[in-house]
Amino acid sequence: MTIARLALLTTLFTPAVFAAPLTVDTYNPQEKGIFAVSSTLVSGPKEAVLFDAQFSVKDGEALVEKIRHSGKTLNKIVITSGDPDFYFGLQPLMKAFPNAKVVATQQVVDHIRATKDAKLAFWGPQMKDGAPTQLYVPQVLASTTFMIDGERVSVEEPESYAAYVWIPSAKTILG
């Protein structure tokens, strides 16, 4: 076998180890927010997944602008915790990206479902116009592992109401 053929075969049959790396872009409202929780947009060349949606709809709107500015297709929003500072900001995101699936582990979904109304009753008056007028309960993740533009992402500690995410190619933990 010639070197040229060997090089061609190696190129054709090598897995996507040379795929473009994922970009990790974090938003945190800092002192402007009631809770300085981070939301992270992880994207490849075409796709993007948002991890956590902020506490207020105002910060959710800032995420909408960040995602639009990326030029990527938002496929999914993963909620890593059942606490409202991770999902109250979903309303503007769902309006802007209606095709994006909102997902979480079963335990996170159960926690949100069980506590969302009481949390909104408590926090809504304090948040004033930053409070959501509509709450979203995520769908249960079909699998704790999924891909972003060919790169593996794993949701860890799925038995907890506060999971975390491992992105091996970016050597990143979120949540």
List each language-model region with its residue ranges.
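Gram-negative bacterial Sec-dependent N-terminal signal peptides
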Residues: 1-18
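Conserved beta-strand hairpin/beta-sheet module of binuclear metal-dependent hydrolase folds
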Residues: 20-69, 163-175
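Extracytoplasmic
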Residues: 22, 37, 72, 79, ...
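Active-site environment of divalent metal-dependent phosphoester hydrolases
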Residues: 35-36, 57-59, 82-87, 109-112, ...
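Short catalytic-loop micro-motif centered on adjacent basic/acidic residues
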Residues: 49-52, 75-80, 154-155
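Active-site metal-binding motif and surrounding structural segment of the metallo-beta-lactamase
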Residues: 58-104
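Binuclear metal-dependent hydrolase catalytic cores
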Residues: 96-121
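Metallo-beta-lactamase
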Residues: 113-162, 167-169
